[in-house]
Amino acid sequence: MHCLWDLPEVMMQANAWPLSSSLGREWHVPGPATQDGLITGLYDEAISRTSCNLVMQALIFMKKYPVQGGPEVMEMPRFWHPNFNWYGPAGIGSARGIKGFRDWHQIPFIAAMPDRGLYPKETSAHFFAEGPYVAVTGWPNMAQTISQAGWLGIAPGNTKITLRSLDFWRVEAGKIRENWVLVDLLHVYDQIGVDALARMREFNKSRTGFDPDTGQAL
């Protein structure tokens, strides 16, 4: 069993996050709505392969935008449930539905880094699936240049960065219903010369501790 710590969320819970506010909703991200993420039965290769192929096709179409045209080239209604839940990491936040996903994550993300997906030789992606669940990881699995404004309040300094992430999807009735996206944001900030942990210490050095009744940082 492995544990993935979302350190920015820990900072937020302590009211000590030192960087920009999230565009999406910040909350305690839930597990699968179907509560069946721990699979104990036999591995179903056919269902797993179908789920994995759906997600991989969805990603292929998403990378067509914006190089090959407007949002329509992604054909999102073909792959994504209209009210799918997109759970981003703390610092980005969560969104619901195609419009919510685009408004609160995709549009500012691609506007700031329009060369997303143009450096496949510099990244890796390892997909695996079981039943309706699909996952991918790469260290890194994205590379792009912050050439425009609009993402996380970062100034467009033409800095090329990589993103290390672990993504999960849940497929339901042939559509992606939930998507968990874990991005190492502290590493992103480090690449542009921002030490988030040092900023946290500097901004919070006068605080005295925690309220024993509420657990809130003072």
Region spans (language model):
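C-terminal and inter-domain tail/linker signature
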Residues: 1-218
